[in-house]
Curated annotation (Swiss-Prot):
Pfam families associated with the record: AMER
Organism for this UniProt entry: Mus musculus (Mouse)
Entry function: Regulator of the canonical Wnt signaling pathway. Acts by specifically binding phosphatidylinositol 4,5-bisphosphate (PtdIns(4,5)P2), translocating to the cell membrane.
Entry protein name: APC membrane recruitment protein 3
Compositionally biased region (Basic and acidic residues): 20-32
Membrane disposition: Peripheral membrane protein
């Protein structure tokens, strides 16, 4: 709204000035002018007392234009009057005021004002504001209205706050009026003006006088500095922190070009840089330059890279190192740069200025305050490497593209990441090596990878990419990102190939394969019980000791554990055959003491004609165990023919192992989940003895059937076993095994194995239904 009001006010003030200039020749009495003007100003002051300072110029502009009309010549207020118009009005009022005052011929200061750069800068700045989106940070942070009005308000505030010194300004103005008034003009005009000012509204008039005097004392220092500050975008430094983005960009190249002796090829570039005189114009051009010159710069750079690569190849094929030109080049390079980067310009002399040589050698930012980029935040700067490339190629069109040390000092992340001050000459030397490799093959001592694995003959695992491709393309330049890219790719290839070769050369670590345990079979554990049984449970475990011709085996049933344990005397003839599926209840489960059943103890003396032996036969697949009591004579317990499955000391069966401790298998008890027991009619050895078996009628722990063991020599001691008598009964959940207390006295074997068992029914978990039906045999 304020800007709109200002524009409408400008139009109205220009119209008023036209009207007053037209009406002024009709007035003849100069003495009446102050009074009439005073009345006009009082009227305007009364109308616009509540308005902004811009609206107070309604009475100001026609007044002073009329005062500048007398014949005696221009009054000293003429120039200041127009300055006030220029100060309080925008650009639209200035041409109108100049055209309005031109016919009178009295506006002396108008020509000087029209040529002042301050107004143009201010005007260009206001026209320059809509182009701000070229600078993203500034465009986002500062709205357009804020830019166009804030500084102007500050200007008006600084200028109009001088009304405190009203009397001093009036006195100085009157003194200057007396000194500067021509001879034809009486000095009474100054006094009349003072009296008019006293008679008028002192606030508005003294404000006008103070403004005019302020501008007259410091003519354009404040305004030019202010306009230059605004137009050159230095004000952005205080507002957004992005200062000196474009303003100094037009001046820095000219300063650099003045430092050293300029070559004729550099002079037109310097003139081009100096052409934008006004900071606003220069800033506008700098804003437009990225969009206009981006594609053309890249195309020129690409062509120059190709030309320089071809030129460098031709130079490398010739004896350029032995030529006097090459020696002079080396000497001058040592003198100018003072660095170790000798192969920067192998085909031509260094640039004629120390500035160019210092820039080309890639010295850090702190060492070159003049060549420092003006863009601190990654914005486009005036002398980007693209423009520098144009200058160098214009100086020597066939030179290698070694003048591109880095993109800029303001955002080269790869350069900052991989930059190492100790390896400054790596970039240009890498270019020469690439070109020389494309011509004469790879160098012998050149490491092809940054991280090469020493694995014998395959040291250089990752060969460098084709140098012919590199030398002909964009990667031929000294762009640091190219080196980083090559290093990264080469390193990845080297690491990958190194790992592959290492894995190929190193035999695979043979993981310790678990011993080929037999397939899951009934448990047969091979060690002595570590501790005696629980004293609360009277079971001591049925221990049967038999001394055969070759071996002595002892089988123990620790009641506190779920697995049977066996100990072999001379050989480890028993192997643990256990199918462990994570459930410890696969074995015989001992109930509590209250549920135990006490069985009668039968003692057989040595003189009796019968003895009792418990023989367990394991089938070929070791899934059926038959426990039978065999009765034999005192002199002959049994023969190897009676044993159906005695085939050796340790015979591996289908899924387990069968035990044959000598001629007779005694006391081998297997921890199984299901047992199949043959009844009397199905017993394969019925002729030698009667095996009496019972199946419990009820599944309670206290209900078991038992048969008293006869004392006849041909009768066997009964062993009550609760098991599934047929495969159809394998689905039973609770099976009980009753082991009587046995005292075995084999007459043929020396030691007497005493077995006392306070037997308790032991619960057996059923076998899975898919297992093969068990087989058992009773041997006498």
């Amino acid at each position: 709204m304020e800007l709109r009001r200002g524009k409408t006010f400008i139009k109205s003030s220009v119209q008023i000035s036209h009207e007053k200039l037209i009406d002024s020749p009709a007035k003849e009495d100069p003495d009446k002018w102050p009074l009439s003007l005073g009345e006009q100003q009082r009227a305007y002051g009364e109308k616009s007392s509540q308005t902004s300072p811009c609206s107070q110029g309604y009475g100001r502009c026609p007044n002073k234009e009329v005062l500048s009309d007398p014949e005696g010549g221009p009054v000293p207020l003429c120039g200041t009057t127009f300055k006030l118009v220029r100060k309080s009005k925008t650009h639209d009022s200035v041409p109108g005021a100049v055209k309005a005052a031109a016919p009178t011929g009295q506006m002396v200061g108008s020509t000087s004002f029209s040529e002042t750069p301050g107004g143009q800068r201010m005007i260009d700045y206001r026209h320059f504001v809509p182009q701000m989106p070229f600078v993203p940070a500034v465009a986002k942070s500062i709205p357009r209205k804020r830019i166009s009005l804030k500084r102007s308000k500050k200007c008006f505030r600084n200028l109009f706050h001088m009304r405190r010194s009203k009397t001093e300004n009036l006195a100085s103005l009157s003194a200057k009026g007396k000194n500067l008034s021509p001879s034809g003009v009486p000095a009474q005009q100054g006094t009349a003006f003072l009296s008019m000012g006293e008679g008028l509204g002192l606030d508005s008039l003294c404000q006008d006088l103070s403004d005019s005097e302020f501008l007259h004392d410091s003519p354009f220092d404040l305004c030019s500095a202010l306009c230059e500050d605004v137009a050159s975008l230095k004000s952005f430094d205080s507002l957004t922190g992005c200062g000196e983005i474009f303003a100094d960009g037009s001046s820095v190249p000219s300063v650099e070009l003045k430092d050293g002796p300029e070559s004729p090829a550099h002079s037109p570039q310097a003139l081009d840089c100096k052409t934008p005189c006004g900071p606003a114009q220069g800033g506008m051009e700098q804003l437009m330059s990225p969009a206009q010159n981006e594609a053309s710069d890249f195309n020129k750079f690409w062509d120059s890279v190709n030309r320089s690569v071809q030129q460098q190849q031709r130079a490398l094929m010739g004896p350029w190192l032995t030529s006097p030109e090459g020696t002079e080049t080396d000497q001058t390079r040592l003198d100018t740069s003072g660095l170790a980067e000798l192969p920067l310009f192998p085909c031509r002399g260094p640039p004629s200025g120390s500035k160019a040589s210092s820039i080309d050698t890639g010295t850090p930012k702190s060492e070159q305050p003049e060549s420092v980029s003006t863009s601190d935040e990654g914005y486009y700067d005036s002398f980007s490497p693209g423009l520098e490339e144009e200058k160098k190629e214009a100086a020597s069109p066939g030179t290698p593209a070694a003048t591109f040390p880095r993109d800029s000092y303001s955002g080269d992340a790869l350069y900052e990441l991989f930059y190492d001050p100790s390896e400054a000459p790596v970039g240009p030397i890498l270019d020469d090596d690439c070109v020389s490799e494309s011509l004469s093959g790879p160098a012998l001592g050149t490491p092809l990878s940054m991280c090469s694995f020493r694995v014998g003959a395959e040291e250089n695992l990752a060969p460098a990419p084709g140098p012919d491709l590199l030398s002909q393309g964009f990667l031929q330049s000294t762009w640091k990102g190219k080196e980083c890219l090559l290093k990264l790719c080469d390193t990845e290839l080297a690491i990958t190939m190194g790992i592959v070769n290492w894995l190929r050369r190193t035999p695979p670590a043979t993981s310790p394969t678990p011993a080929s345990t037999p397939a899951p079979t009934p448990a047969l554990v091979l060690r002595e019980p570590a501790a005696p049984p629980d004293p609360h449970r009277v079971l001591r475990g049925a221990s049967v000791g038999v001394k055969g011709r070759e071996d002595q085996a002892t089988t123990c049933f620790p009641p506190s554990r779920q697995e049977p344990w066996a100990h072999s005397g001379t050989k480890n003839l028993l192997v643990r055959e256990c199918e462990v599926l994570g459930e410890p209840a696969r074995g015989s489960k001992t109930p509590s003491k209250d549920d135990s059943l006490e069985e009668g103890t039968q003692d057989f003396s040595e003189g009796q004609s019968s003895s009792e032996a418990t023989m367990t036969s394991i089938s070929g697949n070791n899934k059926a165990v038959t426990s039978a009591t065999c009765l034999s004579s005192q002199k002959e317990l049994g023969t190897p023919g009676n044993l159906r499955y005695s085939q050796g000391p340790l015979r591996p069966g289908h899924r387990g192992s069968a035990l044959d401790p000598g001629p007779m298998l005694v006391g081998c008890v297997t921890h199984v989940a299901a047992l199949q027991i043959y009844p009397d009619s199905n017993s394969p050895r019925q002729d030698k003895g009667n095996g009496l078996f019972w199946k419990p009628q009820a599944w309670g722990p206290n209900i078991l059937q038992k048969n008293p063991i006869s004392s006849k020599p041909n009768e066997a001691a009964g062993c009550g076993l609760s098991s599934s008598a047929s495969p159809q009964d394998q689905k039973c959940r609770d099976l009980f095994l009753d082991l009587n207390q046995l005292k075995l006295e084999p007459s043929r074997l020396g030691p007497q194995a005493c077995s006392s068992v306070d037997s308790q029914p032991q619960q057996l978990c059923p076998r899975a239904p898919e297992q093969v039906p068990h087989r058992g045999s009773v041997g006498s």
